[in-house]
Amino acid sequence: MKVVISRFNPETDSEPHFETYEVSVSEGARVLNVLDAVHDTIDASLGYRHCCRGGQCGSCAVRVNGEPALACMQEAKDGDIIEPLSLPRIRDLIVDIAPAIAQMAWLNTGSCFECSHVTADDIEEIKPLRECIECFSCISSCPAVGASTYAGPTAIRQQQRLNLDPRDKADRVEEAVAKGLFSCTTCHKCVEVCPKSIETPRKAVEKLRALAVKRGLSLPAHKSLASLIESTGRSVERKEPTFLERVSDVIEPEGEVRATVGFFVGCMFNGRVVQPALDAMEVLKRNGIRVIIPKSQVCCGSPLIRTGFTGFIPELQERNVKAFVDAGVDTVLTMCAGCGSTLKNDYNTPFRVADITEFLAEIGFEEPAKVEGTYTYHDPCHLLRGQHISEQPRVLLKSVAEKFVDMSPRCCGAGGGVKSGQPEEAALIGAVRAEMVKETGADYIVTVCPFCEFHLHQVTGLTVKNIASLMLEGYRKKDC
């Protein structure tokens, strides 16, 4: 088996470099077995950490083909590229975890006479946050770390763990705010790379933000947003006649009816960028789909949940569920990644919720004509990790793009209330994404999120198209 390992000795090297090694290992060998073989048979100077060899200590975390993994658990493949985590480097695959550890709080019981009794219910609530093995893969992958003062997912997870512990006497909410609580974009990359799949955004970040809101510690922009939603039922002020004002309650398809669905438009596509939603209706009509649009639908509540203003959520949920139940639909389509993720994960709906790309890829769609240009696709975090949808939009895009150049996923910085609350941080995160876009050589970016569309246009200067709008271009070209 051949592997490529990133090497760096600060005493002799001016910069890191890659070296290729060929070793003999058993079938099913782990990356750690390969590193051992290189160390024991080829180069004893190779530096790497390990201890338990059972996925419990976290010390052997490295990057394999660009993604964090525990070397003792990741099966080795021929051609693997092994690098250190994206943390300050000491030597070879060894990184400095001291700064990350320094950000973590520890139990503060005060006087032993003040200690509270821990109940079984307390333990159950804390348990998911105790699974952390401190591998720091999450910090290595977090887009907000380095772009702000954010202490990172591990530190915030620990803040909530201690906040839930009745024995702890410190003010963990105020500490969390000081450690950059509102800098998290809730992209869920930390969950994706966590060996224990700890839901830090939902079980720590959003919980602490809700407590911060009750304490008056939220960001001014988030307060204004919450007030707007409570007073109007919408998270954005209208710039033109809204989508719901322009369309009829039922949009009949061209030809045979293949399916009947409800459509949840979301605030951005309703009042700020209406045309992509209108384009989506034309695409659905073209593909034999009857669309029912309840006019009583309101904001899904995603901006409130992500920023901690959860008090108004039950009313929004009730109004939206009732709107579609009364419409008598079994499936509700969304075209905003954030709305779709919220309806799927934060609601308990009696109907199915599906993204428009998910639905079209599932039932089949008419092939459009190819549209000129080179296109790349940006995965919205709330679609990729919030709904586990990745291939479906690419299927649609490849059907219409003259040339498609793929791009690895990375948060653009617009989510989690960061774009509205801390725009400077959002711009820094976006600048990294902009460089990735530049490397593709694409003329256009395509995505399925209005917030990503706005932000990517700002940081790249490129035209950003919604997949529905691009497909409609292809259909119109086909009809010429």
What are these regions (language model features)?
Residues 1-25, 200-480:
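Iron-sulfur cluster-binding electron-transfer modules in prokaryotic oxidoreductases
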Residues 52, 57-60, 72, 132-138, ...:
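Short cysteine clusters
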Residues 80-84:
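Extracellular beta-sheet/turn segments enriched in Thr/Pro/Gly and aliphatic residues
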Residues 43-49:
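Active-site phosphate-binding and catalytic loops of NTP-dependent enzymes
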Residues 29-41, 86, 90-233, 315, ...:
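Ferredoxin-type iron-sulfur electron-transfer modules in oxidoreductases and energy-metabolism complexes
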Residues 24, 63-66:
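Short strand-turn-strand beta-turns centered on an Asx-Gly dipeptide
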Residues 28-34, 75, 242:
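Short, structural beta-strand-to-alpha-helix junction motif
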